[in-house]
């Protein structure tokens, strides 16, 4: 038990050091360089060395206690910056995936709506071109001929660059993850939101490890974009920070798209390979996955809706029996009825 706790503490310390302290310490170093160099002499290494030497010769850090305090302050500052980057990373991840963009603030929601509309128009144009090439290829095969594959492949690539499915979100990464839900519903009538918690509990350990690693890679990629937001204010003191910001944004965007694609691919593969295991454990049979079995599995896993709330007691109906006479009491304003949230309509 002691060895296990020691190993766990070692791994936690390594993660704390690699995810928070080291990136935060690099940010503090760049910040110090930005303050020391400024805009006029951004790459003057002798000036930077001189400023650092003067700071090191300060009486406040000359003693052993001062150095300890300085080291603790640097570690705390680096960890604080790392935590800020993690928090910003959560926000940038929400922006990249845009799963709840209709609930965003009005201005941001309006922008997301316009971007989604433009992406839909581009995708539909590319999809029409791709389907035209497919129809031409099918007609040629019916005549015993063949058409060139390159135009058809190029048209499909152009469509996929916009979105793998009909765009429903303002970002490519969001549509890539959402495409898993669309495809499973279209191919097997599966509701991924209802199926996934049950499927996760039945997946083999190595599959869950791969999916968790892909999810963490997506989080790290979006956090890289968050670091770009932290480096951007340094451009007010040191203009090369603008270049650092641009590099981080481009790298973060590329990694986010790649990580989202990998994560979505693993999600879809896990469902297609192991959804039958869930059906078998629930006693629904182990037949090959089909639309019929997917319908049955979705119905079995979808929770029932809340019952219809009782009728407001303040309302009367002609069929109700007359109430027994009671002693009059001071009037009380009626409580308005609660609207049924998600109640099934008949």
For the regions a language model picked out, list residue spans one by one.
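N-terminal first transmembrane alpha-helix
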Residues: 1-129, 133, 143, 346
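Cytosolic/matrix-facing juxtamembrane and C-terminal tails of multi-pass cellular membrane proteins
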Residues: 1-16, 47, 206, 210-217, ...
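Transmembrane alpha-helical segments and their cytosolic interface motifs
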Residues: 9-24, 187-243
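Juxtamembrane "helix exit" motif at the C-terminal ends of alpha-helical transmembrane segments
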Residues: 28-47, 86, 224-250
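General structural signal for secondary-structure boundaries
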Residues: 41-45, 64-66, 196-205, 290
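Pore-lining and gate-forming transmembrane alpha-helices of multi-pass membrane transport proteins
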Residues: 70, 74, 233-237, 241-257, ...
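Membrane-proximal, non-transmembrane interface segments of integral membrane proteins
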Residues: 89-221
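Long, hydrophobic, amphipathic alpha-helical segments used as structural scaffolds
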Residues: 92, 96, 233, 275-278, ...
